[in-house]
């Protein structure tokens, strides 16, 4: 393995030469720019910057307050407004309404077929008798694998 110093020696020499300060007449040159390269800041811009910084520093606190209010409001358990059966999990009221409408449609369908004698009754074959468990075909399909029963009105 070669030593890296001979390869970098010209670069090191140029770097040291550029960093070397050559003494001048002893008086410092007049400053064209402000010291340390800093620009003179307009007081209005400084006030605007400080105001924006204060606004952004308060934002995490506001977000935390909103989060606390959200948790306080939604983490409390509420008593249901409807009677809940022990055998069924609580569902959204619209899901309950849809099940009622489906059962109402099923009750109304045979009556409509009897009133209109010209309509032919159609028997729908079931694909697999084990999947229906003795229930008729559904006009409303519940979600999450739950069955619609008329017991939980």
UniProtKB/Swiss-Prot annotation:
Residues 1-26 form the signal peptide. InterPro entries: Neuromedin-U_amidation-site, NmS. Its main location: secreted. GO terms for biological process: locomotor rhythm; neuropeptide signaling pathway. The modification Asparagine amide is found at residue 144. PROSITE patterns: NMU (PS00967). It is found in: Secreted. GO terms for molecular function: G protein-coupled receptor binding. Implicated in the regulation of circadian rhythms through autocrine and/or paracrine actions. This is Neuromedin-S. It comes from Mus musculus.
């Amino acid at each position: 393995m070669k030593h890296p110093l001979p390869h970098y020696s010209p670069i090191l020499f140029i770097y040291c030469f550029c960093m070397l300060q050559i003494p001048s007449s002893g008086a410092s040159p007049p400053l064209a720019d402000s010291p340390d390269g800093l620009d003179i800041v307009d007081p209005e811009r400084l006030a605007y910057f400080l105001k924006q910084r204060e606004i952004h520093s308060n934002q995490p606190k506001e977000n935390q307050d909103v989060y606390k209010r959200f948790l306080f409001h939604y983490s409390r358990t509420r008593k249901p407004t409807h009677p809940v059966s022990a055998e069924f999990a609580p569902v959204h009221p619209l899901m309950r309404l849809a099940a009622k409408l489906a059962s109402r449609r099923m009750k109304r369908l045979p009556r409509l077929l009897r009133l209109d004698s010209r309509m032919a009754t159609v028997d729908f074959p079931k694909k697999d008798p084990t999947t229906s468990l003795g229930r008729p075909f559904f006009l409303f399909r519940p979600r999450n694998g739950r069955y619609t029963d008329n017991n939980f009105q």
